[in-house]
A protein has these predicted regions:
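Short, low-complexity N-terminal intrinsically disordered segments enriched in polar/charged residues
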Residues: 11-59, 67, 75
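Bacterial Sec-dependent N-terminal signal peptides
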Residues: 1-11
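Exposed beta-sheet edge and beta->alpha loop/turn motif
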Residues: 105-177
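Short beta-strand and adjacent turn/loop elements
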Residues: 69-73, 93, 160
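A solvent-exposed, acidic/Ser-Thr-rich amphipathic alpha-helical stretch
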Residues: 81-111
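Short, solvent-exposed secondary-structure junction/capping segments
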Residues: 69-83
Length: 177
């Protein structure tokens, strides 16, 4: 029991640090549904976007998030619906906002869920040991990602698969993890 408490305390201390590096991210399997277009450029662009999102999550900084969202399509957030760039900026300006609660701050999430047994998206990334990204191209303009953790694989299911759409030749985040 003492060993478990000691490990849990060490993990809590580690996750509370603010100068942590984002986990390594690499391309895994790539699936093409109904088309055979060369996806290398698209895969590189989406990988760069997801690396930035993971780095920003670990850094607790979504100040650039709205720039990664299509002005036309918006961002699908769980049960919150689709948010415009302006709504994202407005939400980020609030203390204790949705992103702080679910993505960054375990204490806020504990209060929200009324439970001690919670993990933020940031926690999941930091405890992943590295992330392999599977790409599921549903068309030439839509791609869903699946995260595969190197460690703590049972926690992968706590994330929603991010979804990207290509609008006017540029890839944008359409659904968060």
């Amino acid at each position: 029991m003492t060993l478990y408490c000691s490990f849990a305390l060490e993990r809590e201390t580690f996750l509370a640090e603010t100068n942590l590096k984002a986990p390594e991210i690499w391309v895994g399997k790539i699936f093409l549904a109904g088309h055979t277009v060369d996806h290398k450029k698209d895969t590189s662009e989406i990988l760069r976007l997801i690396q930035t999102l993971v780095e920003d999550t670990v850094a607790k900084d979504y100040s650039k998030l709205s720039d990664q969202v299509s002005p036309k399509e918006g961002l699908l957030l769980d049960l919150k619906g689709i948010w415009t760039r302006e709504e994202i900026k407005k939400e980020l300006s609030k203390k204790g906002n949705y992103f702080e609660t679910y993505f960054f701050d375990r204490e806020l999430l504990k209060k929200q869920k009324n439970s001690e047994n919670v993990r933020t998206v940031r926690d999941l990334f930091l405890l992943s040991g590295g992330i392999e990204i599977e790409f599921y191209y549903e068309s030439m303009t839509e791609c869903e990602l699946k995260f595969r953790f190197k460690e703590n694989t049972e926690w992968e299911k706590e994330l929603i698969n991010p979804y990207f759409k290509k609008v006017q030749g540029k890839w944008y985040l359409h659904r968060m993890f």
